[in-house]
Regions:
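Membrane-embedded transmembrane helical bundles of large multi-pass transporters/channels
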Residues: 1-43, 48, 108, 127, ...
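A short acidic-to-branched-hydrophobic micro-motif
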Residues: 75-79
Length: 745
């Protein structure tokens, strides 16, 4: 079967060969399941890396190449007795038992462990002598350590069940393990809650069980195929494990929405009397084309994150682009095939009470609810534009107090063993054993000049309360030196970042002065700080890329420079309001208790840019669907006011339902334990809600009324632009009565 690359012809060809299309998608689904089972875990990583070379990466690369090999995870096990000191025989017996069990895991899990009774108590015993530490270096790289640390945690859990003492573990691997476990749990919870609420909303919007299940099925198919492709691509490029959350969240949101728009138009055309094939053609030529172009806008917005030289941004962008692409493809091929096969069976298992409500409250008819909204708003367009803009600008104001950073271990739930361990380590020791600052000297590291500079730096650091004990080592030929300094703060918090800035900008220059050596500062906090700086540096480029390409695409689609300009301004208003509300709730704590969120001092540093990319694309969805319906009517009547009212009333219920589905999906993820998911889900949900309510129902019709025919203004100098209108062909007027059931041609 030969298909044209035209989305309309693609859908038409799929509807005329439905079983072939369903068969192809079934094979892809099964293959994806196999790829997920065999390859996905190996395609994911708990670490983030840069694709350029900031200070922290340059230092880490030197250490890996010339001193210690691949970076390893350093853990700390803390044993604490309330009534015994480390020199008590009972304390030593318990300490040795735990040490020996950990050592017995073997070199495949534990690279090394230090016993205080062999190495001496210095740095391994608390000041009150009631707590003692077992420093552990995990075997393998950070990903292997995050997997193997579960065996150590099992030992700790078993020992912690005993009475009379407490035992804790913390460190990069333990923190990563807890984070990944919580992420997987939050993912399952978000999918369950979001999926169930989405099903209820679909039932309310569509009124039948079969039609409500179709969007869910296509969303699941899109998610599975995206995960399968991630597993395959991950053999050459490792993805952040958070990409699975991204794919599920975006897949449920756009997969359901895209199917809902096309399926609803199909049912509408069947109700007008078109045959099944004609209804598929019209739905694909109108709603299907809208799905394509709105999906392309989403992809363009997500592509902005690919500019940033960070693997986590590239991972999230790639995962989201994959699932959006499969959702578009499913809407243009699999859905038309299913609509052809189901025909009017898509309306089976009606829910009579919902149908009765829809019949009695048909808001899509002339004079219905949405018609009244449009009429009222367009009577006072200036008031509508000014009032909504003022509200959104006011909601944006808290954003100017934003403090970006990383949530850190301190924001983990209290039940997380890595948090308990970190707090105990911080209370009883310096706290920096597992995440020290590392100063790397690239030159003759054994020379008197370098040795003097190192001693001078140690003296400077001793005056800063954040920094603790320092140790210095060099490689065999003395070409690389490493000064490792403990930090007595949570390595993710702003206080730690400021300490690294002082180290880089003040302390190192003071100590090394004219010493002929390259000095780099690396370590967990330095990597985190560089990530923040890289994000800040590249944000303007991402904004320019997304806004510029979105403007061009919308200008081509609607053949207007006014429509894309307005759409961009409105989207920026909704994104700005979302930013402000995140700061208000998460950072300032307004309503946090009611929503079940944790108040923190910072908003995740990557969140504003991430939200901009995702929200800009998603917000365009509703603009594209609404404006395409308005343009479709305007081309027929030439009456701007009538076209706006028509567009609003024919998309009102649909867009409201679609938006509520997105809010439900994002809200499900916001109910997780991790602060980053709370902030992400809340920000996405509130922005979509704002966009689909006051912007779509008040700001869009008000501005359309004010500008009138100028909405569709295209300068004559641009008249050469190709016509790729989103409205498509409706195939002429529909017959008065519906034709036969499931077949049609």
């Amino acid at each position: 079967m030969a298909f044209s690359l035209s989305p309309t012809n693609l859908a038409r060809g799929s509807a005329r060969h439905p079983w072939r299309v369903v068969g192809i998608w079934s094979v892809m689904f099964v293959v994806s399941i196999m790829l997920i089972g065999a390859m996905l875990s190996g395609a994911l990583t708990t670490t983030a890396d840069f694709t350029n070379t900031p200070d922290s990466k340059a230092g880490a690369q030197l250490l890996e190449d010339r001193l210690r090999g691949p970076q390893q995870a350093h853990e700390a096990v803390v044993i604490a007795f309330p009534d015994k000191t480390y020199d008590d025989p009972a304390f030593r017996a318990q300490y040795d038992e735990i040490f020996n069990r950990i050592q017995a895991l073997g070199p495949g899990v534990i690279d090394s462990a230090v016993n205080l009774y062999q190495a001496g108590p210095e740095g391994l015993v608390s000041q009150d002598k009631r707590s003692a530490m077992i420093p552990i270096t995990m075997a393998g790289d950070l990903d292997e350590a995050a997997e193997n640390v579960e065996q150590v945690i099992t030992i700790i859990d078993e020992e912690a069940a005993s009475d009379g003492f407490d035992v804790y573990i913390t460190g990069a691997a333990a923190i990563g393990y807890d984070f990944q476990t919580a992420s997987e749990r939050d993912l399952a919870r978000g999918e369950t809650i979001g999926g169930l609420i989405a099903l209820v909303i679909l039932l309310l919007v569509l009124g039948t069980v079969v039609s409500a299940l179709v969007p869910l099925v296509l969303a699941i198919v899109s998610i599975v195929l995206a995960l399968g492709m991630t597993a395959l691509l991950g053999q050459g490029f490792e993805f952040s494990f958070f990409v699975t959350n991204m794919i599920s969240m975006m897949g449920l949101a756009v997969g359901i929405d895209y199917t809902l728009f096309v399926l609803s138009r199909f049912r509408e055309e069947r109700g007008r009397g078109r045959s099944v094939l004609d209804a598929v053609d019209v739905a694909s030529a109108t709603a299907g084309r809208a799905v394509l172009f709105s999906g392309l806008t989403v992809i363009i917005a997500l592509m902005g994150m690919l500019i940033i030289p960070s693997t986590i941004y590239k991972s999230l962008a790639a995962g989201a682009i994959l699932v959006v692409s499969f959702a578009i493809l499913a809407s243009l091929t699999l859905l038309p095939a299913l609509m052809r096969l189901l025909g009017d069976k898509v309306n089976r298992l009606r829910l009579p009470f919902i149908q009765k409500i829809q019949d009695e409250f048909d808001e899509s008819r002339p004079g219905g609810f949405w018609d009244k909204v449009a009429s009222t708003v367009m009577k006072h367009p200036v008031i509508g534009v000014v009032s909504v803009t003022a509200i959104l600008v006011a909601a944006t104001i808290p954003y100017f107090d934003i403090n970006t950073g990383s949530a850190g271990v301190s924001t983990f739930p209290d039940s997380f063993r890595s948090k308990q361990g970190f707090e105990r380590l911080e209370a009883d020791f310096d706290g920096g054993e597992v995440a020290p600052a590392e100063i790397v000297i690239d030159r003759d590291a054994k020379s008197p000049a370098v040795a003097g500079a190192v001693e001078k730096l140690k003296g400077i650091l001793a005056q800063d309360s954040v920094f603790g004990a320092a140790t210095y080592e060099t490689n065999a030929d003395g070409t690389v030196g490493l000064l490792s300094v403990q930090m007595a703060v949570d390595p993710y918090l702003d206080e730690a970042n400021r300490a690294i800035e002082r180290l880089r900008e003040d302390y190192v220059p003071q100590a090394f002065g004219d010493v002929p050596a390259n000095v780099y500062v690396t370590g967990l906090t330095a990597v985190n700080l560089d990530s923040i700086n890289v994000t800040s540096t590249y944000t303007p480029y991402v904004f320019a890329f997304v806004l510029g390409l979105s403007f061009v695409l919308l200008m081509l689609v609607f053949r207007s420079i006014v429509v894309p300009a307005k759409a961009i301004v409105m989207n920026l208003l909704s994104v700005g309001a979302a930013y402000g509300l995140i700061v208000l709730v998460s950072q300032k704590g307004f309503g946090a208790d009611v929503l079940g969120f944790q108040q923190v001092d910072t908003v995740e540093f990557w969140l504003p840019l991430f939200l901009f990319s995702v929200l800009f694309g998603l917000s365009m969805d509703y603009h594209v669907f609404l404006l395409s319906r308005i343009r479709e009517r305007y081309d027929v009547t030439g009456d701007n006011t009538d076209a706006v009212a028509y567009g609003l009333r024919t998309t009102g219920r649909l867009i409201t339902g679609a938006a509520l589905i997105m809010v439900a999906v994002f809200g499900g993820f916001a109910m997780g334990d991790l602060v980053m998911l709370q902030q992400t889900g809340f920000g996405l949900g509130v922005a979509v809600l704002i966009d689909a309510t006051i912007i779509r129902s008040i700001l869009v019709p008000s501005s359309m009324k004010l500008l009138g025919a100028w909405n569709w203004y295209l300068p004559p100098v641009l008249s050469w632009l190709p016509r790729i209108g989103i409205e498509g062909k409706t195939g002429g007027p529909a017959p008065e009565a519906a034709g036969g059931g499931g077949g049609g041609s």
